[in-house]
């Protein structure tokens, strides 16, 4: 996921619900890789319960009713779904901006041209090391790095912009500058770093999760590093970056405006249930792909109704529902903490962000 600039349009729907800016749609869970951090624990074989072409198109028909969302076609690897370009073309014809997050290994010149023709605006490719040895070890398949680099070349040839996504782990922290240099060299338009969420296969990567203090260091480094390049840099699943950005900007006497910080000045950290949602391969709507919280199924309830009325989404939209230090925190509206990490580390999706070291000025809830 993550292949997206921020969507545009009004902030609320006619009933007062927030507009949905982004939908990550897991059009298939099948994948040809075996990544150590995969939230879906995906495998090659087809999964039962995936949508037919007609069902998928009927779902697409409902998306404009929640705003003008960007649709992220994700997986698994979305390229393992045979009708994916037909679905993208259908969504594009509806006026929806479509982006895609393949792993890159399956992209051929023909696939890249079909992406372009169907309306794919951007691809995100995950690269977790600056070379084959480090990336392939994380991705679980020898040759994955070389295949992804080749696929990226085909995207370039087809005129499709791409971004690189990198998951932060203890093993690759020391390689971040080299990964960025790789992004520059291959022509990426953006580099998004993802803080590891311990779900799916990543639940077994406890030794790779860095501490709250280390995350603070990484995100401060990221804040400084973004000043050195014109490439768009974004911290994802790292809502506390938006606190750090404001703290640092205040220290430097810089206003947090789009002119100074781009779209980072206009969005918040965790968008789950407030501007973003995830739809699984079987139709379950979730706040995000890392938080398997059942907010309703589009096979039983129209998607716009789920977006507007889900009790879980209502919680995420109400500051008083947050417990621990996230509720009273003065940075709540721009951060919100990672709900998936809260759930996976405490069992409570409304608990405080476990990998944040900040202590709010007050610790009593806002009532």
From Swiss-Prot:
EC number annotated for this UniProt entry: 1.3.98.6
Positions bound to [4Fe-4S] cluster: 31, 35, 38
UniProt GO MF annotations: 4 iron, 4 sulfur cluster binding; metal ion binding; oxidoreductase activity
Keywords carried by this UniProt record: 4Fe-4S, Heme biosynthesis, Iron, Iron-sulfur, Metal-binding, Oxidoreductase, S-adenosyl-L-methionine
Catalytic activity line of the entry: Fe-coproporphyrin III + 2 S-adenosyl-L-methionine = heme b + 2 5'-deoxyadenosine + 2 L-methionine + 2 CO2
Enzymatic class: oxidoreductase
Entry keyword annotation includes RNA-binding: no
Pfam families hit by this protein: Fer4_12, Radical_SAM, SPASM
Annotated metabolic or biological route of this protein: Porphyrin-containing compound metabolism; protoheme biosynthesis
Source superkingdom: Bacteria
InterPro entries: 4Fe4S-binding_SPASM_dom (IPR023885), Aldolase_TIM (IPR013785), Cmo-like_SPASM_containing (IPR034391), Elp3/MiaA/NifB-like_rSAM (IPR006638), PqqE-like (IPR017200), Radical_SAM_PqqE_MftC-like (IPR050377), rSAM (IPR007197), rSAM_AhbD_hemeb (IPR030896)
Keyword Cell membrane: no
GO biological process: heme biosynthetic process
Gene3D superfamilies given in the database record: Aldolase class I (3.20.20.70)
PROSITE patterns, per the entry: RADICAL_SAM
Biological role: Involved in siroheme-dependent heme b biosynthesis. Catalyzes the conversion of Fe-coproporphyrin III into heme by the oxidative decarboxylation of two propionate side chains.
NCBIfam families named among the record's database cross-references: rSAM_ahbD_hemeb, rSAM_more_4Fe4S
Stated name of the protein: AdoMet-dependent heme synthase
Organism of derivation: Nitratidesulfovibrio vulgaris (strain ATCC 29579 / DSM 644 / CCUG 34227 / NCIMB 8303 / VKM B-1760 / Hildenborough)
Organism ancestry: Bacteria, Pseudomonadati, Thermodesulfobacteriota, Desulfovibrionia, Desulfovibrionales
């Amino acid at each position: 996921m993550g292949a997206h600039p921020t969507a545009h349009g009004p902030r609320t729907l006619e009933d007062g619900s927030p507009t949905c800016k982004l939908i990550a749609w897991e059009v298939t869970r099948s994948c040809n890789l075996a990544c150590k951090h995969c939230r879906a624990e995906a495998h090659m074989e087809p999964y039962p319960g995936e949508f037919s072409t007609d069902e998928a198109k009927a779902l697409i028909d409902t998306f404009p009713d929640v705003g003008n969302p960007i649709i992220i076609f994700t997986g698994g690897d979305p390229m393992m779904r045979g009708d994916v370009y037909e679905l993208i073309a259908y969504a594009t014809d509806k006026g929806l901006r479509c982006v895609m997050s393949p792993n890159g290994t399956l992209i051929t010149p023909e696939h890249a041209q079909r992406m372009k023709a169907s309306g794919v605006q951007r691809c995100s490719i995950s690269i977790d090391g600056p070379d084959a040895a480090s990336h392939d070890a994380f991705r679980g398949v020898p040759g994955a790095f070389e295949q992804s680099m080749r696929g990226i070349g085909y995207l370039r040839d087809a005129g499709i912009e791409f971004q690189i996504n990198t998951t932060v782990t203890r093993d690759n922290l020391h390689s971040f500058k080299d990964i960025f240099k790789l992004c520059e060299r291959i022509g990426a338009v953006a580099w998004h770093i993802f803080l590891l969420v311990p779900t799916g296969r990543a639940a077994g990567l406890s030794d790779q999760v860095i501490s709250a203090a280390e995350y603070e260091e990484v995100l401060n480094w990221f804040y400084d590093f973004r000043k050195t390049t014109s490439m768009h840099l974004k911290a994802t699943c790292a809502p506390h970056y938006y606190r750090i950005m404001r703290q640092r900007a205040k220290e430097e006497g810089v206003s947090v405006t789009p002119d100074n910080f781009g779209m980072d000045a206009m969005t918040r950290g965790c968008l789950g249930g407030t501007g973003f949602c995830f739809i699984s391969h079987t139709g379950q709507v979730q706040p995000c792909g890392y938080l398997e919280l059942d907010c309703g199924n589009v096979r039983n309830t129209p998607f716009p109704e789920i977006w507007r009325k889900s009790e879980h989404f209502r919680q995420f939209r109400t500051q008083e529902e947050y417990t621990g230090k996230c509720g009273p925190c003065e940075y709540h509206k721009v951060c919100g903490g990672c709900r998936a990490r809260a759930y996976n580390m405490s069992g409570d999706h409304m608990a405080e962000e476990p990998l944040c070291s900040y202590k709010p000025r007050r610790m009593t809830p806002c009532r």
